[in-house]
Each structure stands twice: as structure tokens, then as C-alpha cells.
């Protein structure tokens, strides 16, 4: 299916690009989330009329994400979990736990925005975590897992 991207989509393209994607990806994700429209002649003409408005909105989103990123970059957050004597956690710290921790600190972060390269945290200590605020804004934060010996 041919679609017009209404915003930048990772691994796909930028605002205004006409790309071919699988039908299911377009119907189930891109179109319902208002990231794209079908590339019909009418839609292309309407997009060209609204292009400046959409670019302005995209620039505002990027600026807002960069402002939050400057505040968030390099910060350290602490979370307490039950652990054994050897430093291993009972359970783990997931991206949902980190997102909840950031929300309590006053940041609007969804769990899908938290990237944990090594998977869930299973040991006490400091761990690096990435937060994707925008497709162009990746921020590194440190999560210090404190063990609560049971």
C-alpha cells in the first residue's frame, strides 16, 4: 500500500515521503495513529496544502522533546527492589518500572519509550537506560537499583 507519512517514522521515512508498506502495517498502526494516510491523488493534494502546518507541528514536537531531553539527560534515578545477599534481585526492574519512576519525577514518559539494551535489570547497582523522547531525541539516564535484603 502506498502511503504519505504525516510525521517522521523510524526506519521508514520523513514527513511527506510517499512510501510503500505492507497493508497490515498501514491499516493497523500507521493510519490509526495518524502517522500516515493513503497516497491517493486527493490526499496528496490536501497534504501539499497542509505541508507547512504539519512541518510546524513536527518542529514544535521536536523542540519540546529536546527541551525535556536537556533536563533529563545524565540524571540518576534510584529504585529499591527486594534482593538476595549476593546482589541479585527477586524479580527484575523492567521498562515499565523505569517509566513509572520517571513519571513520579515529573516526566511524561510511556513504557514504550524506555529502551533497555541488556533487557530487564536483575542486579543491584547502576545501569544505563535510554529514553526515546522523539525519533531524533535519545537521552541516556542512569538507574541506580538499591537492594532491600529480604
UniProtKB/Swiss-Prot annotation:
User: By its UniProt entry, which HAMAP family does this protein fall under?
Assistant: Ribosomal_bL9
Question: Which Gene3D superfamilies would you find in this protein's record?
Answer: Ribosomal protein L9, C-terminal domain, Ribosomal protein L9, N-terminal domain
Q: Name one GO biological process term.
A: translation
Q: Which organism is it from?
A: Burkholderia pseudomallei (strain 668)
Does the keyword field hold GTP-binding?
no
Annotated disulfide bonds: none
Record key words, sorted: Ribonucleoprotein, Ribosomal protein, RNA-binding, rRNA-binding
Cellular component annotations (GO), alphabetically ordered = ribonucleoprotein complex; ribosome
What protein name does the entry list?
Large ribosomal subunit protein bL9
* Annotated GO MF terms: rRNA binding; structural constituent of ribosome
Coiled coil ranges (UniProt) are none
PANTHER family from the entry?
50S RIBOSOMAL PROTEIN L9
Amino acid at each position: 500500500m502506498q502511503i504519505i507519512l504525516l510525521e517522521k517514522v523510524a526506519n521508514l521515512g520523513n514527513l511527506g515521503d510517499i512510501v510503500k508498506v505492507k497493508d497490515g502495517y498501514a491499516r493497523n498502526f500507521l493510519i490509526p495513529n495518524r502517522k500516515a494516510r493513503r497516497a491517493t491523488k486527493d490526499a496528496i493534494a490536501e497534504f501539499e496544502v497542509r505541508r507547512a502546518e504539519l512541518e510546524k507541528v513536527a518542529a514544535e514536537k521536536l523542540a519540546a522533546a529536546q527541551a525535556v531531553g536537556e533536563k533529563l539527560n545524565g540524571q540518576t534515578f534510584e529504585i529499591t527492589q527486594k534482593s538476595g545477599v549476593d546482589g541479585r534481585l527477586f524479580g527484575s526492574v523492567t521498562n515499565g518500572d523505569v517509566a513509572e519512576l520517571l513519571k513520579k519525577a515529573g516526566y511524561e514518559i510511556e513504557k514504550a519509550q524506555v529502551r533497555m539494551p541488556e533487557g530487564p535489570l536483575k542486579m543491584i547497582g547502576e545501569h544505563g537506560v535510554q529514553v526515546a523522547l522523539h525519533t531524533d531525541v535519545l537521552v541516556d539516564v542512569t538507574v541506580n537499583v538499591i537492594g532491600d535484603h529480604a
